[in-house]
Every structure is written in C-alpha cells, then in structure tokens.
Amino acid sequence: MNNFEIKYLIADQYINSILKGESFDLNLISKKLKIDNSIIQTLFPYSEKINKLEYLNIFNSKLDDEILILINKEIRDEDATYFEKILEAFFIKFENLDKYKRALIILSSEKKDKLLNFLILNNQNHKFILKLMKCCGDKDLYFKLNIKATLLNSLYIKNLNELLNREEITIDKIMSNLDKDLKKVFELPFLFKN
C-alpha cells in the first residue's frame, strides 16, 4: 500500500468514526489496519487539530477526484450541453456530500472550525470546478475560467451552507435550488457561451 492509499484510508476512517460516533485514535487505527504506526505518524505528524483538517482535506479531495473521473467517463460520448454536464456534476457532488452530512455538520459545529473548514474546502472546490469545466469541454482562457469558477463556487457554497444548516432540507430541494441558480448564472452570455 502506498502513502496516498494510506492517507485516503485514514481520512475515510476518520469520517466514518464521526458518522458512527466513535472516538478516533491513530494508534488504534494503525493496529486495526495493520499499518506501521511510524508511517502513519510520519504522514500525519501534526497536532490532532491540524491532522483533522488534513483528514477533511484528503477526504474531500478523494470525493472530488472520484466525481471528476465518473463525470469524464459518463459524459465523454454524451451529447449533453455544457450546462447539463455542470449541473450533473453538482448533483453527484451533493449526493455524495449528503451521505456524509452528519459528519460535516459535526466538523463545522464550532464557529472557528467552520471558518477553517470553509477556507480549506473553498479553495479545494475552486480547483475542482476549474477541472470540471475543462472536463466538460470549456476552452476559455484561465482568467475567464477563474471568474466562472468563482461564480459557480459561490453557488456551491450557498447550497452547501443550506444543506449543512437546515435539518429539514432534502437533497431534492438542494438539487432544485442548484438547477435554478445555475440557470440564472448561465444566462450571463459574456461568461457562458458554451
């Protein structure tokens, strides 16, 4: 098992421990997974608080990569519009996040944690959206891509905030909101002409 696989495994273990309401201990995890503890300590050498941010970062990055690979396979030969491809990717991302909603709420329960998580995930999601637009066939220059990614990221954050802060909201409602929001944004012809 290589270091990337170990990191992904540890991040998954961390998120799953939150979902199950179990405590998380790297020493116990190393025994459970039969991985040398010194390797795990080398990969995650920081304080527990910093390591938790790293687990979240790795977990989200893995989700993003899986979504991009799935989208690339599904849309490669599809005759869908640029809008439909972006919308589909957002739907898939929110369906995946909904599975981990409880863990994400717990990780963002304190205001200071919410800010740190926001900063990490905002930057990471911006990169995800840039890759997604390229995957969907966007050929605009990098500057324009960044403007579009910032706009799309703001829609993502708005809907993620609703998902995590409103207990009664359903994934169907989030998807309906995303559809409406994206349609408004795609009406900006100087940005979205694809």
Q: For each predicted feature, which ranges?
A:
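Hydrophobic alpha-helical segments that form the core
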Residues: F143-L164, L178-K184
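C-terminal peripheral helix-coil segments that are non-catalytic and often amphipathic
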Residues: N165-N194
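Short, basic, alpha-helical segments at the C-terminal edge of helix-turn-helix-like DNA-binding modules
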Residues: L56-L68
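Hydrophobic alpha-helical connector segments
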Residues: I71-R102
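Short, amphipathic alpha-helix enriched in basic
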Residues: N2-N37, P45-K52, L56
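Amphipathic alpha-helical packing segments from all-alpha helical-bundle domains
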Residues: K114-D138, I147-S154
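Amphipathic alpha-helical segments used for helix-helix packing
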Residues: N96-L116, M133
